[in-house]
Amino acid sequence: MTSQLHKKGEAWSARFSEPMSELVKRYTSSVFFDKRLALVDIEGSLAHASMLAAQKIISADDLAAIQRGMAQIQGEIERGEFEWQLDLEDVHLNIEARLTALIGDAGKRLHTGRSRNDQVATDIRLWLRGEIDRIGDLLKGLRSALLDLAEQNADTIMPGFTHLQVAQPVTFGHHLLAYVEMFSRDAERMLDTRKRVNRLPLGAAALAGTSYPIDRHAVAKTLGFDGICANSLDAVSDRDFAIEFTAASALVMTHVSRFSEELVLWMSPRVGFIDIADRFCTGSSIMPQKKNPDVPELARGKTGRVNGHLMALLTLMKGQPLAYNKDNQEDKEPLFDTVDTVADTLRIFAEMVAGITVKSENMRGAALQGFSTATDLADYLVKRGLPFRDAHEAVAHAVKVCDDRGCDLSDLTLDEMKAELPNVAALLGDDVFGYLTLEGSVASRNHAGGTAPDQVRAAIAAARAALG
C-alpha cells in the first residue's frame, strides 16, 4: 500500500492535509548547504546502525544492507554523482531516501531510536571536530613560518612603537615572536573548544530520549567522542560549542588582522620595512606603478565577516526556549563560512610570510629616529644612583634640546651633554655612548621575554620545541 509519505514526499507529511508550498520548500530547505555534512552523516548513521544491531533492535541482515547501501551512497557523493533533491529538505532525508531506494525496508529502519534533532547535532560536532584539527595544523604551519622569519632576523633592529610613535629599539625577530604567542594562544583555545565539541548528542532523539534499549556509550566510542551529552534536552538544543568555536576563530582573525595592518604599513614606500612577494599582491587598472598588498588588506576585511558570524550565532540562540527549534538551521552557514575563512586565511598567510623580503637597513634607519634609546640614557643614570623620576626628567630635557637642534642624543659630545644636564653631569662618562647605540639597547634587554638577540633565539628554540 502506498503511504501518505510517498504521496506527498516529506518524511512527516501524513499529519498534514495539504502539501507544502513551493515557496516554503525553498525557504525552509537546507540541503544545498548542509550537504556538506554528508560524509559525517553517513559515519554517524553507520555507528547508529551498528549499535541498533548489537542491541537486537534491528537484524544483522538489516545492518549488512545498511552498510552496503551507505557504501554505495558515499561513493556516489565522493564522485559527484549523488542527486540532491530540494523536496527532501536536508542532507539527512536525501541520504535516507536514497538508502531506502537502494535496500528497501532496511533503510526505513535506520532512523529507529533517533531524530533529526540529535542526528544533525551529532553531524555538526563530528564535522567541526575534524575542522578544529585541520585549523590546528594550519596554525602550526603559520607559527612555523613566523619562526623561520624570526630566526633570520634575530639581530635585525627596528623601532618598537607605542601609540605608533617610536618607543624603543627591538629586533624584528622579537616583534614576530609576539605573533607566535598570539597564534599559540589561538591553538590552545581551539584545543580547549574541541573538548566541549567532542560530546555525543545521538540518543537524545527529538528531546526526551527514546524508549528503545540503546547504548549511547557504544556509539560514542565508535565515533571517537570523549563521552555523551548528559541531558537529552540540552543535547539537541545546545549550540554553545559552535559559538565557542566561532569566538575562538574571531580571535584568530583579530590576530591576523593586527598583523595585516602592520604588513600593509611596513610595505608602504614611506615606511619600506618589507616587501611582499608579487604573487600575493595586485596592481592597478589605471596606475601602472602600483603594487597593492591585497592579501593582508582582504584578511583585515574578512575579520569583520567572522566577527559578524559570531554575533549572528549569539543572536540566533538568545531567545530560544528548550528544546530544538527551526532557528537552529541557521547555525550552519555562519559556521561553515567561519571555517572556510579561517582555514584559507591561515594557509595563505603561512605561504606569504615565507616570501617576505626584509629591508633591514630601512628598519635600522627608522630606529635611529625618534630618540628610541632615551630610556637607556635614563637607565644609565639610575644605575649610577639617580632616582628614576629625576633621571626621566633630565633625559626629557636632553631630548627637547636635541629636538630643537635637529640631532640625536648620540650626536651630542660628552661636554655638550654635561653642559645641558648640569645636575647629572658628574654621573656622565664616556661609557654613556654605549648605552645610546641600538645594539647596546637591545642587548641590554637580556632576560626572559626580552628583545636581546640571545633571548630571541632562546624563545625561538622553545617555540619550535612546543610545536613538536
Curated annotation (Swiss-Prot):
Name recorded for this polypeptide: Argininosuccinate lyase
Gene Ontology cellular component annotations, sorted alphabetically: cytosol
Domain of life the protein comes from: Bacteria
Coiled-coil segments: none
Amino-acid biosynthesis as UniProt keyword: yes
Organism in which the protein naturally occurs: Paraburkholderia phymatum (strain DSM 17167 / CIP 108236 / LMG 21445 / STM815) (Burkholderia phymatum)
Main location: cytoplasm
Pathway(s) where this gene product acts: Amino-acid biosynthesis; L-arginine biosynthesis; L-arginine from L-ornithine and carbamoyl phosphate: step 3/3
E.C. number: 4.3.2.1
Subcellular location as annotated: Cytoplasm
